[in-house]
């Protein structure tokens, strides 16, 4: 296992796929990073030289926000929206979908488990 940005990147995978194990790096970003370092995207992580690993680490640390820094920034943005009580912040507070999705029949994941409402009781005979 190679460590990049405090994440164990699997050695048996291709470099481009291995980089996607880092939070904040998707396939397109991984491809750009590989082009900058001039590493083939089809090369396996275990075949990378020490120099190439150092180059990957330095580019990721200098140009991209990943892992803890990115998570912290996202959480601070959500907290700021909650504090100023804008529409998106209110949706976060109420645990409802933020980006305009319908909630009449869907949004079970966001709203939580359905709560049963008791109907009219039948009289006993």
From Swiss-Prot:
Keywords: Ribonucleoprotein, Ribosomal protein, RNA-binding, rRNA-binding, tRNA-binding. Gene3D superfamilies: 1.10.8.50, 30s ribosomal protein s13, domain 2. GO terms for biological process: translation. It comes from the Bacteria. GO terms for cellular component: cytosol; small ribosomal subunit. Located at the top of the head of the 30S subunit, it contacts several helices of the 16S rRNA. In the 70S ribosome it contacts the 23S rRNA (bridge B1a) and protein L5 of the 50S subunit (bridge B1b), connecting the 2 subunits; these bridges are implicated in subunit movement. Contacts the tRNAs in the A and P-sites. PANTHER family: 30S RIBOSOMAL PROTEIN S13/40S RIBOSOMAL PROTEIN S18, SMALL RIBOSOMAL SUBUNIT PROTEIN US13M. This is Small ribosomal subunit protein uS13. It comes from Orientia tsutsugamushi (strain Boryong). The lineage of its organism: Bacteria, Pseudomonadati, Pseudomonadota, Alphaproteobacteria, Rickettsiales.
């Amino acid at each position: 296992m190679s460590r990049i940005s405090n994440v164990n990147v699997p050695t048996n995978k291709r470099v481009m796929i291995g980089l996607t194990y880092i939070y904040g790096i998707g396939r397109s970003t991984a491809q750009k990073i590989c082009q900058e370092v001039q590493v083939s995207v089809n090369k396996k992580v275990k075949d990378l030289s020490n120099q190439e690993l150092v180059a990957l680490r330095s580019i990721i640390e200098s140009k991209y926000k990943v892992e803890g820094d990115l998570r912290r920034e996202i959480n601070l943005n959500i907290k700021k929206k909650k504090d100023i009580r804008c529409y998106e912040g209110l949706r976060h507070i109420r645990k409802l979908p933020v980006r305009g999705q319908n909630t009449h029949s869907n949004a079970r994941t966001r709203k939580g488990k359905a709560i049963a409402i008791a109907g009219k009781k039948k009289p006993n005979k």
